């Protein structure tokens, strides 16, 4: 595994754009493969996770073409997926495995999905329960991957999600698009809504009311052309970096501004770093725009409840910069972090302590004391892309050099991360 050395910075300046949003790219890739016609996407995610989704859809009969101008074309199968001759390898991608299981549960053939060692430790019973309620036949390996999915005729259900999970919601809705009747999902805490937006964009009949979303079975998907908005979860690392420097000036071009994903902007604003919206438009139901950030001394805050669910991917970087805020950052109701690519609560705490921070670990979160000075250290990524990027940001204000071990894991979601960071950092 590769190590990267990060030196302290004096400022953050420039203009940045980001690879296509990972959550949207997954869903577009799957639905385009099911659609009639050829879909064309600009700025599709360059990460390994979304490459896993496209590879699986190719094994199931879709044709994926990478054009010289960066456009990705997906020639769909008009709802007629074919059985894969081999296991479907989802790599490190929980999104690929969970959402694709919903689609495969309704197909007239059997499938097996596998993943790498990290993915094979992540919980899968959360999708098995609703799919079985719909009449699906799916087996896990002690609640984990590999998964064996036997195609079945599905019946619509009303499902209440036991944990906030957009992947589970999309899994059930994707299965519901093939089921008899109208399938509904109710959430106590609303999660990102890219699945339902994408279903509607591709032609499914979708209805949304507050925290309830429904899809009518028998959907016929049609191809679309789209520019995938820049991934705001990737932009979050640069938003937090810019917020650390009082004279920073960074323009964020073409990033996703979906309200279910933009909580990072609200949180930074509440701590004193207010975003300025230069341009906003809608594309296939998704808001996208160009913004800047007015940096200020960050006050700190407590994150809990629904806000935790809205920030699940951004929590590591917020925790990593917590020591630089005035009053610190506390995160609660975040047990889900323990079953991500790493135990992100334990790993964040260990790495912050390595940099000299005072941090308290809870079963469901952590508390980072504010107004601390951090020093450079050896950081262990545990092959978790968000850990590597979070501590690269923390290193920008630390005293001395920081070494990120296993830094090449950023390829999971943002292969260009360190190149982009070097372009905007002044030292």
From Swiss-Prot:
It comes from Koribacter versatilis (strain Ellin345). Belongs to the EPSP synthase family. One of its GO terms (molecular function) is 3-phosphoshikimate 1-carboxyvinyltransferase activity. Pathway: Metabolic intermediate biosynthesis; chorismate biosynthesis; chorismate from D-erythrose 4-phosphate and phosphoenolpyruvate: step 6/7. It catalyses: 3-phosphoshikimate + phosphoenolpyruvate = 5-O-(1-carboxyvinyl)-3-phosphoshikimate + phosphate. Disulfide bonds: none annotated. The active site is at residue 313. The gene is aroA. The keyword Nucleotide-binding does not apply. Monomer. Phosphoenolpyruvate binds at residues 22, 94, 122, 167, 344, 386. The keyword Secreted does not apply. GO terms for cellular component: cytoplasm. It is an enzyme of class 2 (transferase). It is found in: Cytoplasm. It comes from the Bacteria. This is 3-phosphoshikimate 1-carboxyvinyltransferase. Its EC number is 2.5.1.19. Catalyzes the transfer of the enolpyruvyl moiety of phosphoenolpyruvate (PEP) to the 5-hydroxyl of shikimate-3-phosphate (S3P) to produce enolpyruvyl shikimate-3-phosphate and inorganic phosphate. Keywords: Amino-acid biosynthesis, Aromatic amino acid biosynthesis, Cytoplasm, Transferase. CDD domains: EPSP_synthase (cd01556). NCBIfam families: aroA. 3-phosphoshikimate binds at residues 22-23, 27, 165, 167, 313, 340.
